[in-house]
Amino acid sequence: AITLGSATTIPAEMFAGCTSITTVTIPKSIETIGTSAFDGCSKLATLTLGTGVTTLGDRAFADCGLTALALPDNVTTLGDGAFSNNPNIATLQFGAGLTAISDNAFATNNAIESLTIPKTIATIGAGSFANWSKLTKLTISGNTLTSIGSKAFENAALLADVYAEPTTAPAVQADSFSGAGTSVQGSKTFHVASVEAYSSWT
């Protein structure tokens, strides 16, 4: 068992590489989880984040074995690669306080088939959802999203349908969807508010 006492921060790399850890419950007293704090905890399957958490450092839970993830509403800062290479995450819930998805935040997933970007998100970073092998449907909600980074959905080979609700097309890079939909007959389909508004996507 791990007891954190009255601490408000879990230091960088504190539990990195601890392959015996299977379950982690972060108490509400913790506000910040440092860089690579649980990086490489390959058997960590169950994570409960306390409502006090506001900041997750770079690669905080990278290379773990998580099966589900729910971000509390107080989380406002998500470090680069915070949950990268957690291929078994089957359910992903974004908190209401998150406005930006960092680079490589959730890269590599082999379980989720449908992803909805909530209306609170303004930017999607480079490589943030790259290598999602089962993703078939992407929904971008609301009117807040302004940009999608390079290779954000790279190699989502089964991505057949992208539903984009914003009336103004978010800025995309030439490779934001590189390799996406390549295994779909007829390739992927963009369902958008206006063909003219989204001309930059084609």
Residue ranges and their predicted role:
Residues 11-14, 34-39, 57-60, 79-82, ...:
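Consensus positions within tandem repeat domains that build extended binding/scaffold surfaces
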Residues 37, 60, 82, 105, ...:
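Generic detector of bulky aromatic hydrophobic side chains
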Residues 1-9, 19-32, 42-55, 64-77, ...:
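Structural signature of tandem-repeat unit edges
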Residues 174-181, 197-202:
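Short, aromatic/basic amphipathic alpha-helical patches
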